[in-house]
């Protein structure tokens, strides 16, 4: 499976590490050369320097025959535009966009097809949901010593 990860911050780097270790064909896109070089040295990935929302950069990354694009930049708007552009080039590609601004959450969910999104992810919201879920277990915060 060919996967493109746009945005190589904490989320993008973690995805690159995990997915390349699982044997996926990974191409990274970022505007920072140093970030790309660091990830290419550490993981079995390809890299493209450029703006992930431009057709030129996406084509260099191989979007025309990619199976999945993960837009994980720090800018929600860029992630949406990147996903839409990728889908415009390759209508069969699946897209996942990181959307962190709560103002966009409902709107993006309702317009998922318009934005050509297979899935949206909000890491901060997911962390909050997981913490809330764990706190529902009565013994979660209780620690026993066995020594």
Predicted regions, residues:
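Cytosolic regulatory regions of ion transport systems
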Residues: 1-147
């Amino acid at each position: 499976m060919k996967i493109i990860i746009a945005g190589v911050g904490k989320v993008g780097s973690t995805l690159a590490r995990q997915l390349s270790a699982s044997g996926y064909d990974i191409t990274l896109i970022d505007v920072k050369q140093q970030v790309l070089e660091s990830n290419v040295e550490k993981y079995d990935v390809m890299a493209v320097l450029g703006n992930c929302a431009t057709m030129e950069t996406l084509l260099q990354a191989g979007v025309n025959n990619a199976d999945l694009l993960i837009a994980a930049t720090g800018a929600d708007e860029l992630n949406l535009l990147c996903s839409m552009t990728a889908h415009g080039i390759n209508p069969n590609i699946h897209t996942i966009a990181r959307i962190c601004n709560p103002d966009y959450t409902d709107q993006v969910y309702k317009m998922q097809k318009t934005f050509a999104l297979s899935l949206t992810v909000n890491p901060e919201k997911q962390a909050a949901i997981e913490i809330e879920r764990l706190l529902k277990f009565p013994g979660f915060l209780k620690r026993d010593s066995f020594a």
